[in-house]
A protein has these predicted regions:
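Short, Lys/Arg-enriched N-terminal segments with co-localized hydrophobic residues
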Residues: 1-7
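Conserved Rossmann-like nucleotide-binding pocket used by diverse enzymes
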Residues: 8, 34, 60-62
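A short beta-strand-turn-helix
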Residues: 11-28, 70
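Conserved helix-turn-beta segment immediately C-terminal to the redox Cys motif
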Residues: 26-28, 45-64
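Alpha/beta-hydrolase fold active-site loops
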Residues: 28-29, 82
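Conserved redox-active cysteine motifs that mediate thiol-disulfide chemistry
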Residues: 33-47
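Structural micro-motif
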Residues: 70, 76-85
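Non-catalytic, surface beta->alpha helical segment in thiol-disulfide oxidoreductase systems
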Residues: 88-114
Length: 114
């Protein structure tokens, strides 16, 4: 749908960066817990990119490789991936587990926001 713009999805590589990007963020932020070997995670990549282009002015989009930051995945009890968590002012609001089609993903995010 959107061509030319590069999506702004921040990759988180440390607990400190997580605190900067999510915990201390005012407003909505989203984190995608994923792994390179996960097929459904790879299916969600373009869905996330398009969602960021649509909702990027309302939600700060981030992603975490669970193999790189296992302790952070443990902190949020990530049992299945992809797991996508929506935060508001650093507090978890809601989460989605598994791959979701584009329209449904954007619709669910819009419904999760106030």
């Amino acid at each position: 749908i959107f061509k030319g713009e590069k999506p702004m999805i921040t990759e988180i590589h440390s607990n400190e960066q997580f605190d900067t990007e999510i915990t201390n963020h005012k407003g909505y932020s989203l984190i995608d817990f994923w792994a390179t070997w996960c097929g459904p995670c790879r299916m969600m990549a373009p869905v996330m990119e398009n969602a960021e282009k649509v909702l990027g002015d309302k939600i700060h989009f981030c992603k975490v490789d669970v193999d790189e930051l296992q302790d952070l995945a443990g902190r949020f009890d990530i049992m299945s991936i992809p797991t996508i968590i929506l935060f508001k002012d650093g507090e978890e609001v809601n989460r989605m587990i598994g791959a979701v089609p584009q329209e449904e993903f954007i619709s669910q995010l819009e419904n999760m926001m106030d």
